[in-house]
Amino acid sequence: MGSEMCIRDRAGLVGSDGETHQGIFDISYLSTIPGMTVLAPKNKWELSDMLKYAVDFSGPIAIRYPRGEAYDGLREYRAPIAYGRSEWIHRESGIALVAFGSMVKTAEQVWENLKQRGYACSLINARFAKPYDAEMLSELPKKHILVVTMEENVVSGGFGEHVAAFYQEQKTETSLLSIAIPDEYVEHGNADVLRHEVGIDAESVIGRIMEQLRK
């Protein structure tokens, strides 16, 4: 095996395991390690594919996945894993949802709601937080008025912050909304309730998007 693999269980909010077990900082600290690759699956099928990919990978690699029952949705979307490349689930224009890991499930709910409201909307499964898909990110502002990043990690050092830095470095003007957990410890509680409290559930995300579009 050519890789140094880290399997990150309990990534994101874990609810009943308690405050000390909330996995909401790992994207931030893992992304600071030179040469580290950080990825997360959207469902159980992609987790299997990522594990197989990691076995033959050369270099340090971390796969993060959440606690609880494995998500079985979006099974028909199973493009091969390619280094630093995302996966388009719905390709349209208007609003772009770029979701990482477990937030793809939430993003699919948001996408369906926005479509019902009459908005054109794309959905991208980021797959990699490091390295992120720079080619995909460069393409989005050409056909989208709003780019929304979605992650189950704190804001500081997270996926959304890296995307914002990328657009700034490229001097790309785009409206960007980062959906992430506030920079604070999250208490013990039911995971679904906690997601609503920190603003990363589908209802909260839709509200944030509507507010952003009104600006």
Language model: regions and residue ranges:
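Alpha-helix C-terminal capping segments
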Residues: 3, 32, 166-170
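Conserved thiamine diphosphate
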Residues: 10-56, 208
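Short, small-residue-biased leader/transition segments that mark boundaries at the very start
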Residues: 1-7
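Acidic-residue sensor for enzyme active/binding pockets
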Residues: 4, 46, 151-152
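Active-site nucleophile and cofactor-binding loops and adjacent substrate-binding regions
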Residues: 8-9, 40-42, 152-157
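Thiamine diphosphate
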Residues: 13-23, 56-215
